[in-house]
């Protein structure tokens, strides 16, 4: 074996032995696996000022809940380990995402107060056709314009559809296949106790005691109680000119989210549209949920949420994002204390890249009840807030 001059010099002084150098040079399976593993994550912080006299807000994600108003917040600290799968081979990998902080408490993978496994799955590739990719374990939902990680969204606050209608995650198996450069498909099956937006914040309405987690109720569900999902995505090719990169996404999720009394079906449609103005991007999403066939408190109920997105890159470092929403339901999905509700929402966000690896944003959000019922926001029809968000990514 050939040693470099520094190794020989260290061996001469007794700092290392040539035997240990030989051993260190040998390939070990553990070292080989770790060499392709990446560590990443972020720290998500915010400060929110509610412009009203109270703290009652619309049912959005935890990072803008009533307990985050008028103060400083550490929302999430996330650590991620991942070994991606290789192209074109019988390849294997994995992903583990762990969340720490108050946002973790609402996730389906919550282990204890302030800790959750957001994702934890084995990734497998079968080189059949263009390659079939499998995720086995806990994985993110296949529907939704927005995601749990705030920095990856156009706005800091989440849409009404994200929090109230869409799943936060599934535990099961998901298969994905890229038919060609334009069309991709996926299909999966998961446990029936996975978090589902319809009942995610309303366990009592689904017939179970408040405070019970989905996993604790698995023994109460039928063996056939599963969630089924599928999606199709169509992307415009480079030959489409200025439309290149645009996409149309259609997905559906059906399953017994929290027991046999409810049978929700969610249809999701999302569009991301490039424009002839390269600085301008457009998007839209629709979440349509119907709890057909159920006999419980939510049997036959519906909920719909629509969102329209506009993004404009003002300068190299400054970007503006706007989201307008309209949502309605037959069971009070979006507003506190409602049996039926209608709400409009307007969110405007400025993103300025001041520091490397740091996302710095300021956001104005306005929610207004338009169903004609009692004023839901501490006696007011409107809820307005200002948010400063800083996220460090590594």
Report residues per predicted region.
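Gram-negative bacterial Sec-dependent N-terminal signal peptides
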Residues: 1-24
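Extracytoplasmic loops and strand-loop junctions of Gram-negative outer membrane beta-barrel proteins
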Residues: 59-65, 155-159, 209-216, 251-256, ...
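Detector for outer-membrane/organellar transmembrane beta-barrel domains
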Residues: 230-344
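Outer-membrane beta-barrel "beta-signal"
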Residues: 232, 352-357, 380-394
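Conserved active-site loop/cleft motifs that coordinate metal ions or position small ligands
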Residues: 320-323, 349-351, 357-365
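C-terminal beta-signal and adjacent terminal beta-strands/loops
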Residues: 356-360, 364-379
